[in-house]
Regions:
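Short alpha-helical interaction motifs and adjacent low-complexity tails used for partner binding
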Residues: 1-604
Length: 604
């Protein structure tokens, strides 16, 4: 690209105009408009550091620190790519001696980011610039944008309560920019560091658990869990046509149940710092959901529902004796992929049948074939948290979307999964100190690792279609869906997740801590009639009805043998708030009565 091309390039010219409009919208606090304009800039110039930095600030003001962190991190990646590209090369784009390496994706990204940054500098200049002048201006521009990105990233992680990661980027800022006077007044890494330490000490005083394991707990924060205002992929799940379509699918899995639109209580989002029961600030009202109802009696021990899912993952498919597609036990005869198989009888991707291999290759395997994801599996298996499997569900969703060239949120396996409700958008939203953010947030799991997984599949995350497909809000929407509906099977010996899966129809069953059905996880999920009085049994009992005709079928999203407070903690993630089933309300009243009795005794 030479000087003439830069000055005439329609995308660059449009991008420049949009940036000015977006900045004006941001200044007047028209935040959704500003976000839309910055996103449009990225569709014209997808390697634009400035657009990522400013959209990051916009997300932070909108009350989405998680999305702000994602944009700021991508801006830093572009800045690093530019620096690497500039090493040992002439600066003016299009120079004949410029070294080009088409096989180096990192260099290609740096080249595109360099051209975009150089072009904006050139468009702002009234005359052609010499190389030394360009070098000086580029350094000033890149340094300024990187400093802003680092500071916004640290602030965003602080707001999301990922304090350890926030400190990491504050330290990076202090190292890169030791002279604070050379930075804009609003960028102060030392002041931000001091504030983070103060918040950490405050949290330790509020919750003693943070004193015991601060390095882990201070990396896990939270963020808003909602349908983003710009998310146009979420279907109207309560439309009569949608419900009819889902019931047609349900008929393939069970003839004894049907999906209906129901009203469920709005869940309480507040709690005290120690996770104890609050007796005030209750919420009331109801909201629409889907539920599953019995069309005829279902008996204890009767398996009445079966559903397969291609979104089934193994914690270590290369060393498992389970089918990578359906999670069934492998027999003596199994199928492999020659491109993945290394000749070691103890490793490699394996399927239990020709049919499973065919399905895998048609749906997702080409994007994963012969790729090295060992680092992902090692990280997953190092954790005992069942949420670690969500990274693997993301990976398979990405692979399916890439293979089928379909937006991740439009995949049939994902589209109708319940993750969040569409709530009214409040531009002046600020999270309450008592409000537990309903979507857990971890910077590694939800920002850096997904980017690394996409890069392993040769996805340039800055390409226009990648911005739309794999922007962080898409990842967060998927994460919310997986937290809400994913099932998992834990290995009896290690206590770690062995299998996880998401099933569309399974997700339609609502939760109760006093369920009338129970399930078994695998590539195929089975529902069986259940009663806490009878306990778990595989024997069909014709004499005991678990669910009467016309009643709602209630599954369970947590271990129902736990006590009230532990169940509330475990169910919070899937439900997005306090469980308010009949059992919990009854036990909550008992806890409240005990508390009032204790207070009465102390007052005497």
């Amino acid at each position: 690209m030479n000087e003439v091309t830069i000055l005439d390039d329609p995308d660059l010219l449009t991008s420049q105009t949009l940036i000015h409009k977006a900045a004006a919208a941001l200044f007047r606090k028209d935040l959704l408009v500003a976000r839309e304009l910055y996103t449009e800039v990225l569709s014209h110039t997808p390697y634009n550091i400035l657009a990522y930095v400013d959209r990051s600030k916009t997300h932070l003001e909108l009350g989405y620190p998680d999305l702000a962190a994602g944009d700021a991190y991508r801006a830093l990646l572009l800045g690093d790519a530019i620096r690497e590209t500039l090493q040992g090369r002439t600066l003016i784009p299009g120079s004949v001696d410029r070294k080009v390496n088409d096989g180096d994706e990192g260099w290609a990204i740096g080249e595109q980011a360099f051209i975009t940054t150089y072009s904006h500098i050139r468009l702002l200049s009234e005359r052609a610039l010499g190389e030394e002048h360009i070098k000086k201006l580029l350094k000033i521009a890149v340094d300024g944008m990187e400093a802003s990105a680092l500071f916004t990233l640290a602030r965003s992680l602080k707001e999301a309560r990922c304090f350890m990661d926030a400190l990491t980027y504050c330290k990076m800022g202090l190292t890169r920019y030791p002279d604070a006077s050379a930075l804009p007044q609003e960028i102060n890494f030392q002041a931000e560091t001091d504030m983070i330490h103060q918040l950490m000490e405050q949290k330790k005083e509020e919750d003693p658990r943070f004193k015991l394991n601060p390095n882990i707990l201070f990396r896990h924060g939270g963020c808003r869990r909602e349908v983003y205002p710009w998310n146009h992929h979420e279907p109207d799940r309560y439309n009569a046509k949608t419900v009819a379509s889902l019931n047609a699918k349900m008929a393939e899995s069970s003839g004894k149940v049907e999906i209906r639109v129901v009203n469920l209580p709005i869940l309480q989002k507040r709690q005290d710092p120690l996770n104890k029961l609050e007796l005030s600030d209750k919420v009331s009202g109801s909201e629409k959901q889907l539920g599953v109802y019995a069309k005829e009696d279902i008996y204890v021990g009767e398996t009445f529902f079966r559903e397969m899912s291609p979104l089934t993952v193994l914690s270590d498919p290369e060393y498992s004796r389970l089918c990578e597609f359906c999670a069934a036990d492998l027999g003596e005869d199994y199928e492999t992929c020659e491109d993945c198989w290394e000749g070691d009888e103890e490793s490699g991707i394996m399927w239990c049948s020709v049919e499973c291999k065919k399905n895998a290759i048609e749906k997702y395997h080409p994007a994963l074939c012969a790729r090295d994801f060992g680092w992902v599996y090692r990280a997953i298996n190092a954790s005992i948290s069942t949420s670690s499997a969500h990274s693997l569900l993301l990976l398979k969703t990405y692979a399916t979307a890439i293979t089928l060239d379909t937006h991740p949120l439009e995949l049939p396996e994902v589209k109708y999964l319940y993750g969040v409700n569409r709530v009214p958008f409040y531009p002046d939203y600020t999270p309450s100190t008592l409000e537990r953010q309903a979507l857990p947030f971890n910077f590694t799991n939800q920002v850096t690792r997904p980017i690394q997984m996409l890069q392993e599949m040769d996805v340039d995350i800055f390409q226009p279609n990648a911005v739309d497909f794999f922007d962080l809000w898409v990842i967060q929407t998927l994460w919310a869906k997986f937290i809400g509906v994913a099932s998992a099977r834990v290995h009896e010996r290690t206590g770690r997740t062995e299998i996880a899966a998401v099933h569309m129809l399974y997700s339609m069953f609502n939760h109760s801590c006093d369920p009338n059905i129970t399930w078994e996880c695998g590539g195929e999920v089975n529902f069986t009639g259940f009663s806490r009085k009878c306990g778990r049994t595989s024997e069909f009992n014709n004499g005991v009805v678990a669910v009467k005709k016309g009643e709602e079928c209630f599954s369970h999203y947590c271990d129902i043998s736990l006590d009230y407070s532990d169940r509330q903690e475990h169910a919070w993630g899937p439900l997005g708030g306090r469980c308010s089933c009949s059992r919990c309300l009854e036990e909550e009243a008992e806890v409240a009565a005990e508390l009032m009795s204790d207070l009465s005794i102390k007052s005497k």
